[in-house]
Design a protein with these regions (language model features):
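A broadly conserved sequence feature marking short terminus-proximal activation segments
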Residues: 1-8, 29, 279
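Conserved mixed alpha/beta catalytic, RNA-binding, or beta-rich assembly cores of soluble enzyme
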Residues: 3, 46, 109-239, 244-441, ...
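Non-heme iron-sulfur electron-transfer modules
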Residues: 3-16, 42-72
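Short beta-alpha connecting loops at secondary-structure transitions
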Residues: 6-7, 23-25, 218-219
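N-terminal amphipathic alpha-helix/helix-capping segment at the start of soluble metabolic enzymes
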Residues: 11-26, 62-127, 354-361, 478
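Local cysteine-cluster metal-coordination motifs and their immediate loop/turn environment
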Residues: 25-43, 52-56
């Protein structure tokens, strides 16, 4: 018996454009911007457009079909929004357990912790340090996402005052951390309208925390350390109570319980994605900073290292939100790069727009080079050109986001494509010479390019780090 026959919701791998098309108005009205309803259905299945772009579907006539489609397209992991406005962070929203099955959405959010017992100067310094963390990686700005304000004092007024200070200094979304409902309510009186994540409800305080979540319309974390059965029970109770936006914390144990931590995260995500367990179909929160609670007596650098590798483990073990204590660049950078790589869409390579780029102040005698539009290749070449302070033109050829050697082998980079790109770029009107420097890994195309373009081809270095030396030794416009 198939999964459809037993009544399970259609999975993303089983869902076809026909399934969606059958429930659309099928009028080909083009209000969605597509030529016909089938084209729109295809984009909906690929999650390229929301179903709400079909305006007729939102009318009373198609209300039943709209509800069916929303249920059909509902992700296995509910998407929860923390914060408001431009800085709002979406967590969850996963359709599959493993990225290669489709793709991942909403990269793991990273929050840095603050406490209500920090001196004002230290608080401001820590906020600025985290907020200023930025790193450009293949054209993307990698940064942190949130702050987690912890009540270590247990004093409602202190907690409230600290949150006010934090909100004065940053617009990042907040996680408010306390198991005491009175402390939490004090914080929510200040931050409630910014939709913070309430951390957390447990078996002792769930009712009070649920009331606060409903009152302030905020998402709520559910905490049941190393007890999935209790976690499900709490989720069921909270859903029945009316709280819909939940985030699950099954506990993070950095030492003896590390295996349990990874197993729990995996079992929860598997239950939701593979077996349709809706009680576990919520974002997961990991707290690598627990290493600081269990590491008394150990050197600070050792604890930072432990927290860093634990964060990396949880990123690849389905965590949708992490709370960290370490804010050092060396500890954060590996994980934001790991996160970016994990959340890259495997269905399409990371690419840049093809076309002509200028570096420095090139003139009619400046070198002309070309590379592919694979993002990693382009930004590596661009970085080496800039560091070498070279005034030149760089032609970016469309290879569908594939690197030079692979593009040549797969016929995505051909002499014909280079000739076409040269013609379309208008470079012939910008320089007097007719010399083109090509990547060393595209050397086999040199003869064909010369025949098709009439340009003299210079075979450049195999690695872009050699460009400055190559220009210095080999380049002459005459």
């Amino acid at each position: 018996m198939t999964e459809r026959e037993v009544g399970r919701k259609i999975g993303v791998k089983e869902l076809s454009p026909i399934d969606v098309y059958k429930l659309l108005p099928r009028t080909n009205c083009k209000e969605c911007g597509e030529e016909n309803c089938m084209a729109f259905a295809t984009k909906v299945v690929n999650r390229e457009v929301p179903i709400e772009k079909c305006k007729p579907l939102l009318t009373k006539e198609y209300e039943k079909a709209y509800k069916q489609l929303k249920e059909m397209l509902k992700p296995a992991i509910k998407e929860v929004v923390v914060g408001t406005g431009d800085k709002a962070v979406k967590i969850g929203g996963k359709l599959v357990m493993y990225r290669h099955e489709f793709t991942y959405f909403n990269p793991t959010a990273i929050a840095i912790d603050l406490t209500d017992e920090m001196p004002d100067e230290a608080l401001a310094e820590r906020i600025n340090k985290a907020a200023q963390f930025h790193y450009e990686y293949i054209g993307m700005d990698l940064h942190l996402d949130m702050f987690a304000v912890r009540s270590t004092s247990g004093d409602p007024e202190k907690f409230k005052a600290t949150i006010e200070k934090v909100m004065d200094k940053t617009s990042f979304p907040l996680v408010l951390c306390s198991f005491d409902p009175k402390v939490m309510e004090a914080g929510l009186t200040v931050a409630g309208n910014t939709r913070p994540l309430i951390y957390a409800a447990n078996k002792d305080n769930w009712r009070e925390m649920a009331e606060l979540a409903l009152k302030y319309k905020c998402p709520l974390a559910v905490f049941a350390p190393n007890d999935i059965k209790l976690l499900k029970s709490l989720v069921k109770t909270l859903l029945e109570y009316g709280v819909e936006d939940l985030v699950l914390d099954p506990g993070t144990f950095p030492t003896d319980g590390l295996a349990d931590t990874l197993n729990n995260f995996t079992m929860i995500r598997r239950a939701a994605c593979k077996y349709g367990d809706e009680l576990l179909g919520f974002p997961l929160i990991g707290v690598p900073m627990t290493v600081w609670l269990e590491g008394e007596g150990l050197p600070e650098e050792v604890l930072k290292w432990r927290e860093t590798y634990l964060a990396g483990m949880l990123i690849v073990r389905f965590a949708d939100l992490l709370i960290l204590h370490t804010a050092d660049w060396w500890a954060l950078l590996p994980n934001v790069i790991l996160r970016q790589n994990i959340y890259t869409d495997p269905r399409k390579p990371v690419a840049v727009e093809p076309g002509l780029r200028t570096f420095g102040n090139p003139d009619e005698n400046s070198p002309v080079m070309f590379t592919t539009n694979f993002a990693l290749t382009y930004y590596t070449v661009a970085s080496d050109i800039e560091s070498g302070k070279i005034d030149c033109y760089l032609l970016v050829v469309d290879t569908e986001g594939i690197a030079v050697d692979s593009a040549v082998a797969g016929r995505k980079l051909t002499a014909e494509k280079v000739a076409e790109a040269l013609k379309e770029s208008g470079i012939e009107q910008k320089v007097k010479h007719r010399k083109l420097i090509i990547p060393g890994k595209a050397a086999r195309l040199s003869g064909e390019i010369e025949e098709l373009t009439g340009w003299q081809v210079l075979v450049g270095p195999r690695d872009s780090s050699g460009i400055p030396k190559f220009i210095q030794e080999k380049w002459s416009p005459t």
